[in-house]
């Protein structure tokens, strides 16, 4: 919950109870500010600056690997489950080399080759090819991490069963996996890959969020901490890897003309939930390895 929301609740509680022992804080602005500043800093301490929060995909000589985006066809899919290296969905074939580039970076991880070789490695692909109008963002705006919060049976392990929102009840808020991600210096394990064919469209922040239930909103939002975080704008046609606890944001089109953007994201690590109202089913019948939630995640 944001500090400003806590302040509103505090003042409302004081109004309901004129004899509240903390009523003195309403008139003592310095003490009031001191308390909430301390709360803010305590929450901010869970956002740890880490160079391993994201990285560019690079060649052996250290140069960034450039991505050759295919001719656009208007694809618009979100978190579609695919068998990495195996699925043969015709309209995704032009993106095969980009997908393969990401997967091969993971094959040094223990157990990855076996999953890949046996066709048991499920990833989640997002491709959006669309016009972005001036002042608009193509993807989700606002500073956030991919890992949301959930309750009940959603954590710590998925039960691979379709459930409704009642699964959220009767438990504390906890972080849900949305790709996880670890960096070992020479290779990545799990995580998320992202690229775009336009400049100034996404910003990544070199931090990892710990104890996200103390910091983010239920959708991973971090907007209230923006003033204390600095980031890097992604370069176009360049693949980036990051974790589901890495802050990032989609940026608006700041030109005076519409731009046609191709956005690519591949989640190669485990996820805890898959939202049927927001995500794209696989036409070949591949199922997500996660709890399937049939309700709107924003309700």
Regions found by a protein language model. Give the residues of each.
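A generic structural signal for short, non-catalytic loop/turn and secondary-structure boundary residues
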Residues: 1, 17, 120, 136, ...
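N-terminal auxiliary "cap/dimerization" subdomain that precedes the catalytic jelly-roll/cupin core
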Residues: 1-120
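Exposed regions on extracellular, virion, or secretory-pathway luminal proteins
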Residues: 2, 19, 135-140, 230, ...
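Intrinsically disordered, low-complexity cationic segments
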Residues: 19, 28, 143, 218, ...
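Hydrophobic alpha-helical segments and helix pairs
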Residues: 91-170
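Short His-Asn-centered micro-motif
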Residues: 128, 143, 195-197, 242-245, ...
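Catalytic core of non-heme Fe(II) oxygenases with the double-stranded beta-helix
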Residues: 136-235, 274-277
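Catalytic core of Fe(II)/2-oxoglutarate
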Residues: 220-299
